[in-house]
């Protein structure tokens, strides 16, 4: 999900993914392969074992948080997450200009952001007066 509106941290551009184990243990491969300045700039990488990875080029940076040990090869960071039944894991991809602090979001913050996002979109759709494609718009 991408938090909607001006929620808890409007200065941060993030995409969140929740991985929830239902049955069996599933291994996810997580890859980050950013292309800065239309692939004209190479990233400088910093690894944060057990927490995530950051790629920076010039004044731009992306950080992928998620309790993953990454390995960087060329312009790509790859790691793995195992999710078992009843387990919930989060990934948060964050873009910032001039990223400095390493601040992984906690599970509570991510859960609250999900709740806020759902509430935002429910309020938005409640005002939708579209006819014809309303069901498709609502579902999306």
Question: Where are the language model's segments positioned?
Answer:
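Acidic, mature catalytic/reactive cores of soluble proteins
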Residues: 1-140
